[in-house]
């Protein structure tokens, strides 16, 4: 059986379901595939297929995530759904599944619950830019005023965490009714809420800027000296494009970036005119000695990224079962922070009133590195100690 070819005809968007346990995230995910399958735009995935998601390892952390794909008339979607609450926390902080937008599922019968809040806060911290709400289980609420009340609560909660609560689309319905319906007609009344939701997702969550359209950045993995030609740095282009003859900055390990010109680009020993996001390339740098550039620095379009030493981050601390620490750590803890291609020592300051951090915790902290690194908001990192990963984090704010 030949593999189906991925046809890139529609814009692609990554989304996921978030929300409190038992509010219907997985039921909704299954219902979306069912209704879109009736329109010939998805393969139906039953609840059990999604719920028994295989374990994945991302940066040494075990995460259960279900990946589902489907299409609307407008776009192609990759949708992630996590069975357990801890899986969500890990998923969002490690960026195992980067989301361009999220569907927040809230039960109309219960209203917002603790994990509803936690997921909204996490989404904000790790830069999930847009949220669409599905108010589920409305068939279980007799009083329409109660539904209105829950809707107001959800809007207030979103506004509290920095989302435009008044503008966010809220679609009401019953995912279970849609999933259990026997109708083969995609326009049956019980499917309307699902079609309405996908229409809101199509319209409200913008197609993200592709990596190739962003400013050039390449983390340096290795440095070589080629006799008679100069210094070559190698790495995988993270974003943007680079043409021979363009000026770049070497950023990191020094207070100020250093400018140079890329005089040649090679891939698989062949000369390239242009490198694009995803390419593994070697770049020949003009006027740079081998000892003036090192792994852990980045090559970047001038003026687009600066070296920093101090930032705030949201961090998930691994449990001992995940290979993390067996004991808590305290204020002033000094592990290694692994950014892109290298480790840098840094000191942790916990928030006021927080004495220590236990394995399994999800915590906000301030970090001060001993040398400046090319950092920007949203950058992921691992916290390591003696070569093993003990935490995973995402930069939320740059301080200096």
UniProtKB/Swiss-Prot annotation:
Transmembrane segments: none annotated. GO terms for cellular component: cytosol. Belongs to the TRAFAC class translation factor GTPase superfamily. Classic translation factor GTPase family. EF-Tu/EF-1A subfamily. Residues 10-209 form the tr-type G domain. NCBIfam families: EF-Tu (TIGR00485), PRK00049.1 (NF000766), PRK12735.1 (NF009372), PRK12736.1 (NF009373), small_GTP (TIGR00231). Keywords: Cytoplasm, Elongation factor, GTP-binding, Hydrolase, Magnesium, Metal-binding, Nucleotide-binding, Protein biosynthesis. GTP hydrolase that promotes the GTP-dependent binding of aminoacyl-tRNA to the A-site of ribosomes during protein biosynthesis. SUPFAM superfamilies: EF-Tu/eEF-1alpha/eIF2-gamma C-terminal domain, P-loop containing nucleoside triphosphate hydrolases, Translation proteins. Residues 81-84 are annotated as: G3. It is found in: Cytoplasm. It catalyses: GTP + H2O = GDP + phosphate + H(+). Residues 19-26 are annotated as: G1. It comes from the Bacteria. Signal peptide: none annotated. GTP binds at residues 19-26, 81-85, 136-139. Residues 60-64 are annotated as: G2. This is Elongation factor Tu. Mg(2+) binds at residue 26. Residues 174-176 are annotated as: G5. One of its GO terms (molecular function) is GTPase activity. Its EC number is 3.6.5.3. InterPro entries: EF-Tu_GTP-bd, EF-Tu_GTPase, EFTu-like_2, EFTU_2, G_TR_CS, P-loop_NTPase, Small_GTP-bd, T_Tr_GTP-bd_dom. Its main location: cytoplasm. Residues 136-139 are annotated as: G4.
């Amino acid at each position: 059986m030949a593999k189906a070819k991925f046809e890139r005809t529609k814009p692609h968007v990554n989304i996921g379901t978030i929300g409190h346990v038992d509010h219907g995230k997985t039921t909704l995910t299954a219902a979306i595939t069912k209704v879109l399958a009736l329109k010939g735009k998805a393969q139906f995935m039953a609840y059990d297929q999604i719920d028994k998601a295989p374990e994945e390892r991302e940066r040494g952390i075990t995460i259960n995530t279900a990946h589902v794909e489907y299409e609307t008339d407008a776009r192609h979607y990759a949708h992630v759904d996590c069975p357990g609450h801890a899986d969500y926390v890990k998923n969002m902080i490690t960026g195992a599944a980067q989301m361009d937008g999220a569907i927040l599922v809230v039960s109309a019968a219960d209203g917002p619950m603790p994990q509803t809040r936690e997921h909204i806060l996490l989404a904000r911290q790790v830069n999930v830019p847009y949220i669409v709400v599905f108010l589920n289980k409305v068939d279980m609420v007799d009083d329409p005023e109660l539904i209105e009340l829950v809707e107001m609560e959800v809007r207030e909660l979103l506004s509290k965490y920095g989302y435009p609560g008044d503008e966010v689309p809220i679609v009401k319905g019953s995912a279970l009714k849609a999933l259990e319906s026997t109708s083969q007609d995609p326009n049956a009344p019980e499917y309307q809420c699902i079609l309405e939701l996908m229409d809101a997702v199509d319209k409200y969550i913008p197609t993200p800027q592709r990596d190739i359209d962003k400013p050039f950045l390449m983390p340096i993995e290795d440095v070589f000296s080629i006799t008679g030609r100069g210094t070559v740095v190698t790495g995988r282009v993270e974003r943007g494009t680079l043409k021979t003859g363009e000026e770049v900055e070497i950023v990191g390990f020094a207070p100020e970036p250093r400018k140079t010109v890329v005089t040649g680009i090679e891939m698989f020993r062949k000369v390239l005119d242009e490198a694009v996001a995803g390419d593994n390339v070697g770049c020949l740098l003009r006027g740079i000695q081998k000892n003036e550039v090192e792994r852990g620095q980045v090559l970047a379009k001038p003026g687009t990224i600066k070296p920093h030493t101090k930032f705030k981050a949201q961090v998930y601390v691994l449990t001992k079962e995940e290979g993390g620490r067996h004991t808590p750590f305290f204020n002033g803890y000094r592990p290694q922070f692994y950014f892109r291609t290298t480790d840098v020592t840094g000191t942790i300051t916990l928030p006021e009133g927080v004495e220590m951090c236990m394995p399994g915790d999800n915590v906000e902290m301030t970090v001060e590195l001993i040398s400046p690194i090319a950092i920007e908001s949203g950058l992921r990192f691992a916290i390591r100690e003696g070569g093993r990963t003990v935490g995973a984090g995402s930069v939320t704010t740059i301080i200096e």
